[in-house]
């Protein structure tokens, strides 16, 4: 009898382990990056009290853990279960939308971003990603509206400014696009992606020397940018400067570009 009583006393903490205790343990595991353990504990808490009003947050936390573990489908399911309880949570909608985009489920992501914008019309993340989706669909008028909403709140927003430049290019407003591009470069003079983008625009507009100058600026900042050497080779080849083109292509090969990718271009350099 004494032994039974001792076992009963020792087991009290386990038996009395509450929903809140398990949730706290799960959160501690998240902080320690013990994600497998955190996932197990969140599931345990959800089974303990399936009707608890806090389960929306638990499903959301579970989804975030699963996202970090690379379990995208399970994370989407967890966020969906959370949204079944709290359908107007913009944070959960944004988290699920990002995963839908990752899975290339564009229409589902679009609907989530629309729902966020209905709730928070000035939400920058939703506006930017919806604009991106509109761009993919070639719905340029709608994309411009979203980018402009972002710029009304954040006039220096780089992503929105790039979006407007791309729209101007697609709609034939080349001077407007180039003016905006020049301003962007002046604001971000060491951003290689922006310099590379301007070089591409300059080349398309027949400004080969300006493009080559920008590519050289990129290579000063990032000497191992193989794509710049490929582009330099393409420009030189177009200019009939075969020796310079070959030199650029050979440098790209040294930096890891496959010979098969450049084989035809190298033939044209002979």
Label each region the model flagged.
Residues 19, 230, 234, 238-270:
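Terminal, low-structured helical/coil segments at or just beyond the last alpha-helical repeat
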Residues 19-20, 53-57, 90-91, 124-125, ...:
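Helix-start (N-cap) detector for alpha-helical repeat units in TPR-like alpha-solenoids
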Residues 31-32, 65-68, 102-103, 136-137, ...:
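Register position in tetratricopeptide repeats
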Residues 48-51, 85, 119, 153, ...:
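Structural marker of alpha-solenoid helical repeat scaffolds
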Residues 57-61, 95, 129, 163, ...:
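Canonical tetratricopeptide repeat
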